[in-house]
């Protein structure tokens, strides 16, 4: 693309009349939305992949019903990712997951109408088929990258095949969460929600593939969950959904709640600020009441897993974690530090006010 950089007649906007060039800002929005969406999906998978590794190292006697000690149990804890729909977004997402997380090719499967067109991914070892039900039944995390018009039929195909513990991650923004929950008959669904700022700087570039764009430090900063740089704003309820999804993953393996809290602290709060050393009490640590009401915690037995959380409810209503994270700026800072570290960017404490900008959640859909 560098060879064409100075050839104005070959640029996208060359043939657009001057009076219509106002709409070119939509191109930047589209690209920003795709990059930010893929980055958040990659962070989500990185957290799940790391959690899977941590779970493999836990003693097998955590819960009486956990009785398998063989290699099959270890394999069962590996993260497997399925993608339904492999248009432009699906391909970019696949490449980001393979190169950034990274997800091993053998742990990634794609279902698309034209699997024969994905020759390059097949060469890498990714299984590409046209079998939505098979991919849905195999995956622990399932991404929906199809068109809104295709979604009802796809849901009909896969709803009876989905494991209760599978986390469905939907990029189909036109379908509200309650409707998606009904179509899939499934509660473990995460759907990021975005809105756009009116005034913004287009930081997203033009021609780079998303994995390459995510090597740019400015773009990495722009994708931070608490940052509105670049004009694409994530609904911070996504962070809550991620945390409760991780808890559900532990619950599916019958891990006691006390051990889950240790895992979450190790997974989400490994980075520390200088203030954590000078003032240890300011360093955030997760507690039971951060995720459940005090009345429920009082009646929770010590050697029990967390209850199963409906992720659609988590994203649509106020939760104990909503109140906790909004009242704890240091927790937001720690999550921002971790997010940047996942993408290979180390940021200083002085940069945090520009990275971890507190943004109010979007108006929830009904």
Swiss-Prot record:
EC number(s) given by UniProt: 1.-.-.-
Q: Does the record bear Oxidoreductase in its keywords? A: yes
Q: List S-S links within the chain.
A: none
Q: Which residues form the signal peptide?
A: none
Which keywords annotate this record?
Oxidoreductase
User: Which class of enzymes does this protein belong to?
Assistant: oxidoreductase
- Give the similarity note: Belongs to the pyrroline-5-carboxylate reductase family.
The protein's role, per its UniProt record: Probable oxidoreductase.
Name of the protein this chain belongs to: NADP-dependent oxidoreductase domain-containing protein 1
Name the gene: Noxred1
